[in-house]
Amino acid sequence: MALYQSKTITVNKPFEEVYGKVSDLRNLEQFRDRIPKEYTVNFKCDTDYVQFRVAPVGDLLLRIVERGADKIRLNVEKLPFKAEISMNIGNVSPSETNIQLVLDADIPFFVKHIVGNKLEEGMDKMADILTLSLNSL
């Protein structure tokens, strides 16, 4: 398995507020206008999943499989390999919360060198979207 980590982002909101927003994926609908247009094709969300298109991969489905005290785990479905994203959420102060996204993917060796940098960039892009969206609440 290969690990790809986003940069750690800081949200200027209390932990409870941030956790409440990211643990229910229906809340992504509020941020839809802040999500780059290329990721809103086939966009659907519900409490436990979000689906969207990523070129050239196709439709992806992220499904929450665990809600922990400071972590939310999501399976990445509709890929030709097993992958999971952990959203690590930390209380920094009464008004600040840190989030880091970690992708754990079972990428075939011959593909890893081709897509590795793109996956890392994708994790950072997701973190940037979260920062903009959550800070604007």
Please annotate each region the language model reported.
Residues 29-30, 39-80, 136:
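Glycine-rich portal/gate segments that line the openings of hydrophobic small-molecule binding cavities
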Residues 17-19, 30, 60-62, 72, ...:
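Short acidic, gly/pro-rich beta-turn/loop elements at beta-sheet edges
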Residues 35-36, 40, 128-137:
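Short, highly charged C-terminal tails/helix-capping segments
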Residues 1-44:
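Hydrophobic ligand-binding cavity/cleft-lining segments
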Residues 6-8, 49-51, 61, 73-75, ...:
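Beta-strand secondary-structure signal
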Residues 77-128, 132:
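Beta-strand/loop substructures that line and gate deep hydrophobic ligand-binding cavities in soluble
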Residues 12-15, 65-68, 88-98:
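A short, structured loop/turn motif at beta-sheet edges
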Residues 2, 6-8, 69, 80-86:
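Soluble, non-transmembrane catalytic domains of enzymes that act on hydrophobic metabolites at membranes
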